[in-house]
Every structure is written in structure tokens, then in C-alpha cells.
């Protein structure tokens, strides 16, 4: 599992990090650690959680003699539930740390909300793509 997980997280994480840093945020110096480290940490940590949930569920489904496709579909859906629920709750039930920190530091709340939406969408996208890559690599074995 380790190689497939590493490839899945690496490809998805780097892809999303490059897209955000270069095209969405458009920083002058894209490799500056104060930008790259927190964004990469949020992307990779959440993708890792989703991937671990999916793999655990996938292995359970396969142990029940489910087909590869059925186990993949079930684990994909169940692993993304926490991410989708957190998207639904942002701003209504919970205020994420990044958004709260920006608001407390004096940033316009609308800008803070835009950044938070971007991060949440990126986390969901990165998690989904890392799952897709993992299952594509698993299918070949």
C-alpha cells in the first residue's frame, strides 16, 4: 500500500499546490515557505485522512467478497462524506482556523471567506483525485 499511497498523495498534492500557488493566488515568489508549507499541509493532511478512510473501507468490502468495482464505489463514497459535511458546515456551524485567523488579524471578512472556500474546494478536489489515482493503481494489481 505504501507506494500507491505515496504516489497518490504526491501527484494529487503537487498538482493542487502548483495550481493554487501559481494560478489562483499568483504570488510573486511561489516557493516562499510561508505560503507553501501551510497550504501543502492542509492539502496533504486532509487527503491522507480521506485516503486512509477509503483504504480501510475498501479492504473491509473486499474481505466480504465484494467485487473490486463495488468495493471501490462504496469506499469512495464513504471516505468523502466527512469532507462534504465539513463543506456544508463552514460558516454556519464552524469557523475554520484559517478564516478565523485572517479575520482576527484584520483582513476583510469577504476575502477571508474567499480564501477559505478556495482551500475547502482544493481539499475536496485533492482528496478525490488522490482516491482516483489510488484506485487506478490498485486496479492494475
Label every PLM stretch briefly:
Residues 1-46:
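Loop-to-helix entry region at the N-terminal start of transmembrane alpha-helices
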Residues 7, 76, 114-121:
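Internal alpha-helical transmembrane segments of multi-pass membrane proteins, especially GPCRs
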Residues 16-21, 101, 127, 131, ...:
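Structural signal for membrane-spanning alpha-helices in multi-pass inner-membrane proteins
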Residues 23-31, 62, 104, 108, ...:
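Membrane-interfacial segments
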Residues 37, 41-69, 133:
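Membrane-embedded alpha-helices of multi-pass transport/permease systems
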Residues 69-96:
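Transmembrane alpha-helices
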Residues 92-114:
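Hydrophobic, glycine/alanine-rich multi-pass transmembrane helices and their short helix-loop junctions
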Residues 117-139:
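Hydrophobic alpha-helical transmembrane segments of polytopic membrane proteins
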